[in-house]
């Protein structure tokens, strides 16, 4: 699957495979070119996220989350999604401003979350 879309992300490909889910991501490095690889994983490896797009308000969201005690390992807008989901649950998407398609795997709850921006600017494909 990643091979079919590698032209959309020429800077590298990564995958994550678990018993009941597999994520593939091809990267176009824009924000945090060194550590912003996806799927991005939280500290206890229970939440995985892939983002296609850009979260415009990620810096203000990051400051709010840091004030609540969340610690970040990257400068990526994608990592904000992981922490926001930990904090807000399924309501995390209501806080996001930008153009995006998100796939998030919550290993603890065996839950796949798919979300797009309100306009649907970014495509979201799944099989």
Regions found by a protein language model. Give the residues of each.
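N-terminus-centric sequence/structural signature that marks the extreme N-terminus
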Residues: 1-127
């Amino acid at each position: 699957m990643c091979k079919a879309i590698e032209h959309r992300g020429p800077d590298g490909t990564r995958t994550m495979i678990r018993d009941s889910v597999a994520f593939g991501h091809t990267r176009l490095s824009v924000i945090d070119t060194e550590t912003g690889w996806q799927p991005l994983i939280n500290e206890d490896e229970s939440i995985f996220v892939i983002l296609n797009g850009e979260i415009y308000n990620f810096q203000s969201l990051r400051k709010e989350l840091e004030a609540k005690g969340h610690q970040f390992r990257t400068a990526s807008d994608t990592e904000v999604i992981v922490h926001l989901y930990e904090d807000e649950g399924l309501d995390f998407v209501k806080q996001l401003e930008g153009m995006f398609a998100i796939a998030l795997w919550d290993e603890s709850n065996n839950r796949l979350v798919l979300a797009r921006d309100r306009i649907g600017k970014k495509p979201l494909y799944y099989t």
